[in-house]
From Swiss-Prot:
Motif range (Beta-hairpin): 92-115
Function: The UvrABC repair system catalyzes the recognition and processing of DNA lesions. A damage recognition complex composed of 2 UvrA and 2 UvrB subunits scans DNA for abnormalities. Upon binding of the UvrA(2)B(2) complex to a putative damaged site, the DNA wraps around one UvrB monomer. DNA wrap is dependent on ATP binding by UvrB and probably causes local melting of the DNA helix, facilitating insertion of UvrB beta-hairpin between the DNA strands. Then UvrB probes one DNA strand for the presence of a lesion.
Pfam annotation, one family: UVR
UniProt-annotated location(s): Cytoplasm
Keyword Nucleotide-binding set for record: yes
UniProt-listed Gene3D superfamilies: P-loop containing nucleotide triphosphate hydrolases, UVR domain
Subunit structure: Forms a heterotetramer with UvrA during the search for lesions. Interacts with UvrC in an incision complex.
Listed GO CC annotations: cytoplasm; excinuclease repair complex
Provenance organism: Proteus mirabilis (strain HI4320)
Name of the featured protein: UvrABC system protein B
Keywords tagged on the record: ATP-binding, Cytoplasm, DNA damage, DNA excision, DNA repair, Excision nuclease, Helicase, Hydrolase, Nucleotide-binding, SOS response
InterPro entries: Helicase/UvrB_N (IPR006935), Helicase_ATP-bd (IPR014001), Helicase_C-like (IPR001650), P-loop_NTPase (IPR027417), UVR_dom (IPR001943), UVR_dom_sf (IPR036876), UvrB (IPR004807), UvrB_inter (IPR041471)
Domain Helicase C-terminal: 431-593
Entry text on domains: The beta-hairpin motif is involved in DNA binding.
Length: 669
């Protein structure tokens, strides 16, 4: 079989990686349903998985616990497989308020959402790649278990065009309207088309850098070509092209009509039940809402909140699982669950939270009972749909270990030869003063420190205390949004400050080679934040530095501490032994600071000649006050655009330049 995946990397597998790759591939070829890759922090788990994918040549879905880690994985996979289809599938909502009803105050909260168009395009691109290609890697969040349009309807709605095809122009326009494309002869953007004589330009919904030109001669397709929608420059001609629907929820007309009849039947039955129970207000509500939705579906082919009728639109029975991204994944697909100790419990918890909200809406007449089938997968449904699975974690959970049995592949030895941090236990009584002296030692060597506390109050007090003693310190907490969190991490790595204080610093899987010390305060207080798994994860934050060290402050050694210290020592001994046998000298990591969060953006390729914020203050010439003001306005616009496009690193860089220019502006004023 020819290789469809081409792995590009300057590195070759090292340490435990070759053994892990061979074991995982062998297990998958032998038909094992569940395997666990127990890889320590910094051991190159992503590179191992990339090698497994390249060796097996199977379409793969990688599940991550949140958007930040999904973006990090997407960025890494893009670098490993530049010639293959690496796609990104996460929730496309920048902001989402689901519809809800609070009976105690008789408050109905209307659904409100802000859709990120670029992520919507990436989602459509992901499903298109899964339907068209074998060399696909989709990096997804738990958004993958939520309802999506039915793949059968989606496939039936596609518009196939080819050179020499006999088709009337009006028929093409009608089909585009069925696919929910809109005609716009002025603003040509994603999901629109324009008509000029016998030429139809279509901007595919899943594309970010090309559009299709259809040239007709009478009723024959004379030429199909792809062109740049911005400049109009023709890239090349194509013999055929498939136009995919603008949304995953597009449905053939006959199925919509059939669904409408079933919705009317359900409405009639529901009205009888409500009237029999003297629920007159609820009966009036559900009748009014449903009839309005039916009218919209009849006229436009869709309505606001059409996903609540997904049971009828997908032709599934009551209680059956909704169609999801897993329905698009081929039967021979592979599933990789990253940070499985977090992701698996997340998958299990989604259904119940969604269900309780919808039951209230149904009970009070805001939705028909069939809306309950617009839901995420139950955990047992997820298990039934999941193909062969590899769980990846430094601290696998009970579920993964039980499912994998003896099929646990350890990746303890790092290719760089780096050892797990040295762990010390020190008394609580002097923890703050002891920490202060350790911070000063690290700051003098230009190294960074992570400090984790148990409570928000303690984190705030500690930050204030360290600031009073002249230390450069910042505080990371749950109220900080994703953009600012990435900025703080970047500033720590750049040396803008030396100490980062937080409560749950293991959450983001932070990769920071500059961190040489992790301090865990009140380590002897048993609980979620001081469990064996949490301690191992937190200790691992210092595992990417040659001088890595973890200090646990506690007056007694709890079971969790003993297990975490024991496991760290076991790994450290194994790593030292391997280095000794193979003559390896540990090397520090030199990770680029722009790597924390970088999603491929639609403007990257095309704007190379456009405005680019420069890297240093010296690059700015001595501008007049008016010119400075103009430049500040331009950079502000650029910064907000980067943030909107999820280019958090670029937004932070532009912010830094803005601060420099503002200081210059004030000095000149």
């Amino acid at each position: 079989m020819s290789k469809v995946f081409k792995l590009h990397s300057e590195f070759k597998p090292g340490g435990d990686q070759p053994t892990a790759i061979a074991s995982l591939c062998e297990g998958l070829e032998d038909g094992l349903a569940h395997q666990t890759l127990l890889g320590v922090t910094g051991s190159g788990k992503t590179f191992t998985i990339a090698n497994v994918i390249a060796n097996l040549n199977r379409p793969t879905m990688v599940l991550a616990p949140n958007k930040t880690l999904a973006a990090q994985l997407y960025s890494e996979m893009k670098e490993f497989f530049p010639e293959n289809a690496v796609e990104y599938f996460v929730s496309y909502y920048d902001y989402y308020q689901p519809e809800a009803y609070v009976p105690s105050s008789d408050t109905f909260i209307e659904k409100d959402a802000s859709v990120n168009e670029h992520i919507e395009q990436m989602r459509l691109s992901a499903t298109k790649a899964l339907l068209e290609r074998k060399d696909v890697i989709v990096v997804s969040s738990v958004s993958a278990i939520y309802g999506l349009g039915d793949p059968d309807s989606y496939l039936k709605m596609m518009l196939h065009l080819s050179n020499g095809m006999i088709i009337d122009q009006r028929a093409i326009l009608r089909r585009l309207a069925d696919l929910q494309y809109t005609r716009n002869d002025q603003a040509f953007q994603r999901g629109t088309f324009r008509v000029r004589g016998e030429v139809i330009d279509i901007f595919p919904a899943e594309s970010d850098d090309y559009a299709l030109r259809v040239e007709l001669f009478d009723e024959e397709v004379e030429r199909l070509s792809l062109f740049d929608p911005l400049t109009g420059q023709i890239h090349y001609n194509v013999p055929r092209f498939t136009v995919y629907p603008k949304t995953h929820y597009v449905t053939p007309r006959e199925r919509i009509l059939d669904a409408m009849e079933k919705i009317k039947q359900e409405l009639a039955e529901r009205r009888k039940v409500l009237l029999a129970n003297d629920k007159l207000v609820e009966e009036q509500r559900v009748t009014q809402r449903t009839q309005f939705d039916l009218e919209m579906m009849n006229e436009l082919g869709y309505c606001s909140g059409i996903e609540n009728y997904s049971r009828y639109l997908s032709g599934r029975g009551p209680g059956e699982p909704p169609p999801t991204l897993f329905d698009y994944l081929p039967a021979d697909g592979l599933l990789v669950i990253d940070e499985s100790h977090v992701t698996i419990p997340q998958i299990g918890g989604m259904y119940k939270g969604d269900r309780s909200r919808k039951e209230t809406l149904v009970e009070y007449g805001f939705r028909l009972p069939s809306a309950l089938d617009n839901r995420p997968l139950r955990f047992e449904e997820f298990e039934a749909l999941a193909p062969q699975t590899i769980y990846v974690s430094a601290t696998p959970g009970k579920y993964e270990l039980e499912k994998s049995g003896n099929d646990i592949v350890e990746q303890v030895v790092r290719p760089t030869g780096l050892l797990d941090p040295v762990v010390e236990v020190r008394p609580v009584a002097t923890q703050v003063d002891d920490l202060l002296s350790e911070i000063r030692i690290r700051a003098a060597k230009n190294e960074r420190v992570l400090v984790t506390t148990l409570t928000k109050r303690m984190a705030e007090d500690l930050t204030e205390y360290l600031e009073e003693h002249g230390e450069r310190v910042r505080y990371l907490h749950s109220d900080i949004d994703t953009v600012e969190r990435v900025e703080i991490i970047r500033d720590l790595r750049l040396g803008e400050f030396d100490v980062l204080v937080g409560i749950n610093l293991l959450r983001e899987g932070l990769d920071m080679p500059e961190v040489s010390l992790v301090a865990i305060l009140d380590a002897d207080k048993e609980g979620f934040l001081r469990s064996e798994r949490s301690l191992i994860q937190t200790i691992g934050r210092a595992a990417r530095n040659l001088e890595g060290k973890a200090i646990l402050y506690g007056d007694k050694i709890t079971d969790s501490m003993a297990k975490a210290i024991g496991e760290t020592e076991r790994r450290r001994e194994k790593q030292q032994q391997f280095n000794l046998e193979h003559g390896i000298v540990p090397k520090g990591l030199n990770k680029k600071i722009g790597d924390i969060l970088k999603i491929g953006q639609p403007t990257q390729g095309r704007n190379k000649k456009g405005h680019k914020a420069v890297d240093t203050h010296e690059d700015y010439p001595l501008l007049s006050t008016a010119e400075l003001e103009k430049e500040i306005q331009r950079l502000e616009t650029e910064m907000y655009q980067h943030a909107k496009d999820l280019e958090f690193e670029k937004a932070a860089q532009t912010r830094d330049k803005l601060q420099t220019l503002r200081a210059q502006f004030i000095a000149n004023s």
